[in-house]
Amino acid sequence: MNGQTPARHYYKKLVPSLILILNCIQFLSHPTKADPILLAFVFAVYLAFIWIIPYVASTAVSLSIFIGLWLLTDFFWAVSGQEQGAAYFLIVFLMIYAAFRLPSRLSLIFTACLIGGNILLLSSQGGSLNTIISNISIMLGLYVLFSSMRFRREARREAERNHAELAKMHVQLEHAHKELQKAHAELQEASVLSLRYAVLEERTRIARDIHDSIGHELTSVIVQLQSLPYILKSSKEDSEKVIQNVLSVARECLQEVRSVVHQMGRSESMVGLTALRGLIHQVEERSGLHVSLDTAGLSEESWPPNVSETIYRILQEALTNIIRHADASHAAAVISNDKSHLYVTITDDGQFTGSLTYGFGLTGMKERAEKAGGSLTFSAVQPSGLKIELSLPLMTTNKEQKDEQR
């Protein structure tokens, strides 16, 4: 029932039924040439029509019912002679219902047929020109009035449907946006974990070096110190040699410890470049996109952890966008620096020609760069492709180097 409540649907049938019943009583109460039984029968058919037509889904069946009522009414008009009050009322009633129930074009054609039939009947029964014009004017006016009411009602319903669909789409978009944010957060967390794993791997390597080099040398020191009391009793010269050997090994251990500590202090920054190479290798294996990395202009390889993470995530998002949207076969990343800044340029040979839409990924890249105190720009590459230029400050690195020198 088009989403209507049962009470409203019942009301829409009850009102026209009462109109028919009241008019039928009025026409029967006045003496006319029309057969009362035939008049009551025609009104009863119309009454049944009101309660049946809402359940007819087929347009063809509905049109057939309307045509049948029209022919029945014209027959009633013809056999009633000059008495055409009840018949004319029923014709107008049928026209109004057609304006509401039939499709717009069919209702217009059906109304034209009704008007044409009225003209023929009035002419055949000697109706005057003024009567014909008056009847046609009334019918046209009523048709325009009720058709406009129908159009407004349909427009309102369409607007309500569109509003409901937009609200539903808005909810779906909000859900999708939350899912994207969740996925993006998980991706960020995975990026951080990959960097941490790289740091742990580097520290494991350093621990292994300590065990293999310093551990061996300290074992040698312990053995020589354990034998020293016996050597002192036997030969003074041999004992001096042992002491010199122990001192030499101890100095080497100290130098090795300093070297390891220095490497551990730099491991979190040096891991940035290692992580980038690992990311590029992973992308090439999984997507088939060829990615080159140029570090010829890189003289400063000691990056702060926040710089390493920012570069890693921006390169990761850039390569993801290239794979998804650019239809590129090659991408290139160039990393360089000067005294105060680190520069990363990412280019591809994809389909981009100059019209850029800032989506979730590009906006996130730009915000990430700005959060790190840097900047990110996008520009077109001739003949096609996209260039991403990232600039990040290295002040934190310079400060760390000064602390190390102290």
Swiss-Prot record:
Residues 35-36, 123-125 are extracellular. It comes from the Bacteria. The modification Phosphohistidine is found at residue 211. It catalyses: ATP + protein L-histidine = ADP + protein N-phospho-L-histidine. Residues 209-396 form the Histidine kinase domain. The chain crosses the membrane at residues 14-34, 37-57, 59-79, 80-100, 102-122, 126-146. Keywords: ATP-binding, Cell membrane, Kinase, Membrane, Nucleotide-binding, Phosphoprotein, Transferase, Transmembrane, Transmembrane helix, Two-component regulatory system. It is a multi-pass membrane protein. Pfam families: HATPase_c, HisKA_3. It is found in: Cell membrane. InterPro entries: HATPase_C_sf, Sensor_HK_TwoCompSys, Sig_transdc_His_kin_sub3_dim/P. Residues 1-13, 58, 101, 147-406 are cytoplasmic. Its EC number is 2.7.13.3. SUPFAM superfamilies: ATPase domain of HSP90 chaperone/DNA topoisomerase II/histidine kinase. Its main location: membrane. Signal peptide: none annotated. GO terms for cellular component: plasma membrane. GO terms for molecular function: ATP binding; phosphorelay sensor kinase activity; protein dimerization activity; protein kinase activity. Probable member of the two-component regulatory system YxjM/YxjL. May activate YxjL by phosphorylation. This is Sensor histidine kinase YxjM. It comes from Bacillus subtilis (strain 168). The lineage of its organism: Bacteria, Bacillati, Bacillota, Bacilli, Bacillales. The gene is yxjM.
